[in-house]
A protein has these predicted regions:
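Catalytic-core segments of thiol-dependent peptidases
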Residues: 279-308, 371-373, 377-473
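Catalytic cores of nucleophile-dependent amide-cleaving enzymes
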Residues: 314, 318-352, 357, 434-511
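Bacterial Sec-dependent N-terminal signal peptides
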Residues: 1-13, 549-551
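Active-site-proximal beta-strand/loop segments in catalytic clefts of secreted hydrolases
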Residues: 163-165, 238-242, 264-269, 294-298, ...
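Active-site-proximal C-terminal subdomain of hydrolase catalytic domains
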Residues: 299, 369, 467-556
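A domain-level signal for caspase-like cysteine endopeptidase catalytic cores
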Residues: 235-263, 326-413
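Extracellular pro-sequences of secreted precursors
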Residues: 10-268, 273-291
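Loop/turn elements at helix/coil->beta-strand transitions in domains of secreted/extracellular proteins
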Residues: 231-235, 256-262, 286-291, 355-366, ...
Length: 556
């Protein structure tokens, strides 16, 4: 056993089975066929973070690239999802073929506080010990389960949920399964959430979609029974009629640049259920339909009400199955006038057609967070942001600012100066409201003071309510509508991810990590779209956080 204390500003300690340095979970595909998929999983240890509980000092267990189970009252342990393609109708079952484990004695593992909003201070949430703390048994009892099957455009898939750690609260024993061989075997053609039809004999996908499948599915390379054809993917724009003339230059550019694009008015599609039916029919008739852009605001092109708290544009892209994974990637330009529509179109056209790719500001990034929380892996928000900073600075970013409340205490003036210098990407993690960020009380007012003419950032914001479109002008809308009144040039942002709901602490942090990871992966001849990076990263939340029940994903 090896112990290593973290060099970060919070008390995290590595406990290794046979390695003195932290090692990440390893997954290996052994074999894959229609009948059976076999996977090997290896784990080399765990991190433990000390916490104060009603029973004294206990520890939270975590591991890189894994997710907390978030079951309130159960031992706080990591789990790991492995996404795999399965048959269109198959019912699968999972079994452990073989395993090895190491036991660690005299460890007291704290219970999970569960999944809750960032409006709640984690320190104010009491530890509750569930019934499993009274049982002389290891929790969880199984080291592998199967989540519900889902359909993601061309494939039906299922997440293999791996639990390499098990805890017996009575004997105070943490069991680490260092080696697992897991079989996922077909048992019938009576599976739930079946993919009942295919729209064409061949699978047409663009380079970005192919890369997303390769990243997501452990057995994508084994799908030899399908014919794959390269295709750019079609875009459908649904626009409030009075803005269609202003949006037409974007339609023309998309078609010229190789992405077949069609625009229709809301008078033709309707809204809410009628629009969903229109999009569904369009999807059924156009096998290459990949992107949906909505142009309008809450009052004339509303998001879909999925629940009391969740309003969703993503819903319009959920076109197969009874799951939340989108077949079509959905974005929005929230505009209030033709002039506003023209301004936002000009942002996109400049970014895609005219930007100087050698401009030094493109190698800059902005990070905004605070010394608050314990989010995923027990990290305070600013530590989470430092990890993102490290990821970006191993890519093409050479400078990333660190605006951290309760660390270096930035002001709104500091942040305005930073944004005015230009930044290609901005990450925010902390508290928010419909009209701003909590850090430095940076609000709509400050966004409209920016003079970053055509030096526009793309923003991934982990915060409450920044994208609440029924607000008179929400924070997301301010970033997209901003203009320098003196020059007439677009300012603010070129796009972003902002949530409708009061986001929880942990689930969106996994999504934000994945967005930055996708952005920075290197592939020969491969260019990302910011929409593809963002929405594929958002779907990762569904994999990592089943306890969240889709709320983060659907409303972001």
């Amino acid at each position: 056993m090896f112990l290593i204390a973290s060099t970060l500003g919070y008390a995290q300690e590595w406990v290794g089975v046979d390695k003195s340095t932290p090692v990440k979970i390893q997954e290996t595909l052994v074999s894959s066929s229609e009948e059976e998929i076999i996977v090997d999983v290896k784990v080399g240890g765990f991190f433990q973070t000390s916490v104060e509980t009603p029973n004294g000092k206990q520890v939270v267990i975590s591991a890189d690239n894994m997710a907390a189970m978030l079951t309130k009252g159960a031992p706080e342990l990591p789990m790991y999802p492995i996404s795999m393609i399965i048959g269109d109708r198959a019912e699968m079952e999972v079994s452990i073929v073989k395993s090895n484990y190491t036991d660690f004695e005299n460890i007291e593992v704290a219970p999970s506080k569960g999944n809750f909003s960032r409006q709640i201070n984690p320190a104010d949430v009491e530890f509750v010990y569930g019934e499993m703390y009274e049982q002389d048994a290891f929790y969880p009892a199984s080291q592998a389960t199967l989540d519900s099957p889902y359909i993601l455009r061309d494939f039906r898939a299922q997440n293999l949920m791996v639990y390499p750690y098990a805890y017996n609260p009575v004997t105070k024993t943490l069991r680490v399964y260092t080696d697992l061989r897991i079989s996922v075997k077909k048992v019938s053609d009576n599976g739930e959430n079946q993919k009942v039809s295919r729209r064409s004999d061949a699978i047409k996908l663009n380079v970005e979609s192919k890369a997303a499948y390769e990243r997501r599915f452990i057995n994508f390379a084994n799908q030899s029974k399908y014919d794959f054809l390269v295709d750019e993917g079609e875009m459908l724009i649904i626009c409030v009629d009075e803005y269609m003339d202003a949006i037409q230059p974007l339609v023309e550019w998309k078609n010229i640049s190789g992405r077949p694009t069609t625009m229709v008015g809301v008078s033709e599609t309707g809204t809410n259920d009628a629009m969903k039916t229109y999009v569904q029919n369009y999807y059924n008739e156009h096998p290459n339909f990949t992107y949906l852009l909505l142009v309008g605001e809450y009052n004339n092109l509303p998001p879909y009400t999925m629940s009391y708290s969740v309003k969703s544009d993503n819903y319009y892209g959920m076109l197969e199955g009874d799951d939340y994974y989108e077949e079509v990637l959905v974005g929005r330009l929230s505009v209030v006038s033709s002039q506003d529509a023209t301004n936002q179109v000009n942002k996109i056209l400049y970014y895609e057609k005219e930007i100087d790719e050698t401009a030094t500001w493109l190698s800059r990034a902005v990070g905004v967070a605070a010394d608050e929380g314990a989010g995923h892996y027990g990290e305070p928000d600013y530590v989470h942001m430092d990890y993102i900073r490290d990821t970006l600075m191993h890519y093409t970013i050479t400078e990333m600012s660190q605006h951290y409340a309760y660390v270096n205490n930035p002001t709104a003036a500091n942040m305005i100066t930073d944004f005015n210098a230009g930044a290609s990407v901005t990450n925010y993690t902390n508290h928010g409201s419909p009209d701003g960020w909590a850090v430095a009380n940076f609000s709509n007012t400050h966004v409209h003071q920016l003079t970053n003419d055509q030096k526009l950032s793309f923003i991934w914001s982990v915060a409450c309510n920044n994208g609440q479109l029924d607000y008179q002008e929400c924070f997301a809308e301010a970033w997209m509508r901003a203009t320098n009144e003196a020059t007439g040039e677009p300012t603010g942002a070129v796009g972003g991810m902002f949530s409708w709901i009061s986001q929880p602490w942990q689930p969106p942090m996994y999504g934000q990590d994945e967005m930055n990871a996708i952005l920075t992966e290197w592939r020969e001849g491969y260019k990302h779209t910011l929409g593809g990076v963002s929405l594929n990263g958002n779907m990762f939340v569904l994999d990592m956080c089943p306890e969240d029940a889709g709320e983060t994903h659907n409303s972001w």
